[in-house]
Every structure is written in C-alpha cells, then in structure tokens.
UniProtKB/Swiss-Prot annotation:
Record-linked HAMAP family: MraY
EC id: 2.7.8.13
GO MF terms held by the record: metal ion binding; phospho-N-acetylmuramoyl-pentapeptide-transferase activity; UDP-N-acetylmuramoyl-L-alanyl-D-glutamyl-meso-2,6-diaminopimelyl-D-alanyl-D-alanine:undecaprenyl-phosphate transferase activity
Organism: Actinobacillus pleuropneumoniae serotype 3 (strain JL03)
Pathway annotation from the record: Cell wall biogenesis; peptidoglycan biosynthesis
Transmembrane regions: 21-41, 73-93, 98-118, 132-152, 168-188, 199-219, 236-256, 263-283, 288-308, 338-358
Name of the protein in question: Phospho-N-acetylmuramoyl-pentapeptide-transferase
Subcellular location per the Swiss-Prot or TrEMBL entry: Cell inner membrane
Entry GO terms, CC: plasma membrane
Gene name tied to this protein: mraY
Length: 360
C-alpha cells in the first residue's frame, strides 16, 4: 500500500524512492509486525482470558503439562493481525504471489480458529472433525495451487529444484499441482504437530522464514538466480516482505510464548504459519529445501505417522508418546531442554539448507 503512495510522492521528493527497495521494506515489515505483536499482545491475552479461551491438556500427557491447563490459547490471532497489517502496508499488492500466500495464511487461520473453538467448547482436545478439517485445508490448498499453476505453468515457476544437483531441474507440468498440494497441507499439519511446547514451533518457523527471505530475494533476482543455478521467478522477490513479516510477528509472539508461556498460538496460528511456509516454498521452487530446513517439523510429523502405524499393525508403540517432543519429556528431559535443543537442530538444518544452494 505504501509502495503506491511512495510512487506518487516521489515526484515531489526523491527521498520517497527508498520505499521501492525490497531491503528497506523487508526491514520495515519485520519491525512493523513485531511492534504490532508486542503492542496488541497484552490486550489479546486479556480478552482470551475473559472469554475463557483456555488450553485443554491431554490426560495421558506429561504431568508437567497439567499446570498449563487454562492458559489462553488462540494467540495465533495476534500473529495473523501482525502479518496481515505489515504485509498490506509494505508489500507491493500488485504482486499475485503475495495474495496467494495471504489467501492460504488466512484461510488456514480460519480453519484453525474453528478447530480451536470446538476444542474449547467441548473442553477436550478433539476439535473440528478430522475429515472436515482436512477437507477445508485441501480446498484452500488446491485453490491456491491451481492459481499458482495458472500464473506460472509456462515458466520456471513449475520446475523442481533438487538440492546438490545443478542441472537437474525437471519441469513438473501437471504434477506440480500434486506436489504443491502435499507440501502446503503437509507443512501446515507438521507445524501444528510441533506446537506442543512453549516456543517450540514459533522459533523454527522464524528461522525457516528468515532463510526463505534470502532465498526469495535470490530467486527474484536474475543475476543471483543465475549464479546459484536456481530458477529465476520474477514475482518471487516480493515474498521477502511476507517472510520478514512472519519473522517479526513470530518475534512479537515469542515475547509472550517463551517458557513459561502466557499464551499459546493454537491451531489458528500453527496451521496458518505452516500453510504459509509451504506456499512460499512452492512459489520459490524450493519444496525439497523446506524438507531439509524444516527437518524438525518433518520428524515431528513422521513420529506421529510411525506411532499410529505401528500401533495399528503391531499393537505396539515405538515412542513413549507422539509427537516426539513428548517422548523426550517422558524420558525425563525438562521442557526447556527439549525446546532449546530442537531450536539448535533447526538452526543447523537451516544453515545446511542454505549451503546446499551453493553446493551443486
């Protein structure tokens, strides 16, 4: 929005030309989103407490979690507000890629909101009926994916980038739709499963979003895309603004979510953030890189799949409890130790992911 205003005002003062630079707007988007999160956080928490929107806790979970029962949830609302306002202010809204991400972000946020509401209303951890939850997540993802495919089907925007391979970038064609669908829905649910400890999901989200800000900038810059041997996607550069808005909103939320948490993001936050990361990965053609950098999310999701599969096939559990962060808690690890170690692992994976851009 401010891009349009600056384009008009630059004729009166060339200083407004600074708004045309992605780096400037990226920094401002981060600061704006973080500022909004810090500002509205106390009021959002207070209203959630008044509405008695408290977290429900599984009775078979770690005993240390029982004290969390009643902690305000649905704090993801403040994340969505911060990202939305910051993006609308600092992004170039003529860019279709920005709208694709916002569509998934708020669409998944709406599904998460309903899911959280039913958990609170029923006073248990069962929210929206699973088949309806996945139905709406799928509908939103497919609408976005078909839109992305329509915009970029004849360009590098539908190539698959394989880490460590410089010249192997197959054109996916219609298979782009299938891959993108699973990336968006899968990432959304993986982040959702990771969100079980204070700050466990939001910090890896911040790290991965920070990395994707760099990748989006390189993907949207012809010279750097050529240098790194990645597809040049002209519209991708504007996603830097969205990525830094996610980082800023995440930092603002972490202020209140760090151990011991004053608020939880709930499904309204985790589903939307995961969906946004998946959509960004699709748009910059780095789905496989997301698997590396978001390795913690992948392992959390796999632990649930393996646990359920093992129990159904063998009537035996692989882990003491899934997702895997609860397994470590039941082994005696204090919650802060689990959280920080998962953060460290994510930092390592993000750095490895960034290095693969050059190791081809």
């Amino acid at each position: 929005m401010l891009v349009w205003l600056a384009e008009y005002l630059v004729q009166y003062n060339t200083a407004f030309n600074v708004v045309s630079y992605i780096t400037f707007r990226a920094i401002m988007a981060l600061l704006t989103a973080m500022g909004i999160g810090l500002w509205i956080g106390p009021e959002v928490i207070r209203r959630l407490q008044l509405l008695k929107f408290g977290q429900e806790v599984r009775n078979d979970g770690p005993e240390s979690h029982f004290k969390k029962r009643g902690t305000p949830t649905m704090g993801g609302i403040m994340i969505l507000i911060a990202i939305g306002v910051s993006t609308l202010l600092w992004a170039d809204l003529r860019n279709s890629y920005v709208w694709f991400v916002l569509f998934v972000l708020f669409g998944y946020g709406a599904v998460g909101f309903v899911d959280d509401y039913w958990k609170i209303k029923r006073k248990n951890t069962d929210g929206l009926i699973a088949r309806w939850k996945y139905f709406w997540l799928s509908v939103i993802a497919l609408i976005a994916v078909f839109g992305i495919y329509a915009v970029g089907k004849d360009t590098a925007a539908t190539q698959l980038v394989v880490p460590f391979f410089k010249d192997f970038m197959p054109q996916l064609g219609i298979f782009f739709i299938i891959l993108s669908y699973f990336v968006i829905v899968g990432t959304s649910n993986a982040v959702n499963l990771t969100d079980g400890l204070d700050g466990l999901a939001i910090v890896p989200t911040i790290m991965v979003a920070s990395a994707f800000a760099l990748i989006a900038w390189a993907t949207g810059n012809f010279n750097f895309a050529q240098y790194l041997h990645i597809p040049f996607v002209p519209n991708a550069g504007e996603l830097v603004i969205l990525c830094t808005a996610i980082v800023g909103a995440g930092l603002g939320f972490l202020w209140y979510n760090t151990y011991p948490a004053q608020v939880f993001m709930g499904d309204v936050g985790s589903l939307s953030l995961g969906g946004a990361l998946g959509t960004i990965a699709v748009l910059v053609r780095q789905e496989l890189l997301l698997v590396i950098m978001g390795g913690v999310f992948v392992v959390e999701a796999l632990s649930v799949i393996l646990q359920v599969g093992s129990y159904k096939l063998r009537q035996k559990r692989i882990f003491r409890m899934a997702p895997i962060h609860h397994h470590f808690e039941l082994k005696g690890w204090p919650e802060p130790r689990v959280i920080v170690r998962f953060w460290i692992i994510t930092l390592m994976l993000v750095l490895i992911g960034l290095v693969t851009l050059k190791l081809r």
